[in-house]
């Protein structure tokens, strides 16, 4: 994080006007909350659970993919979708229990904001969950945009999601 802090000092306001961040694995370590939600979900459906460390390799490409990876081999798509739906609902209510802010992130965000740089965050989490997480971990950071899955905007990694944010 020291490297980023030093780089940040090199930018003046004319050079950098906005900074857009991903959430999971960038601003926050969410593996333990996501893994716990997945394990609760798997147990609810009678499937075996995984060590939380295993979820590091399951996360990425959205919740449906997480549950495809976590479910036993051969699990049908309808069941995977049911796992995703149950897990999403559970996670929405338990998304701030074990998540941790990465070292240096608050200082970086406050430093950028102090320089007048507009801050944004884009995630594939539902918009309601994204806003809840951001309000919990970064209540003092003036994010101009907190964009999650609202059912309308394209999801990451579609380049349109970033382009839409830039247009705002």
Predicted regions and their residues:
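N-terminal helical cap/lid subdomain that shapes the substrate entry/recognition surface
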Residues: 3-4, 12-107, 115, 128, ...
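Short active-site oxyanion
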Residues: 116-120
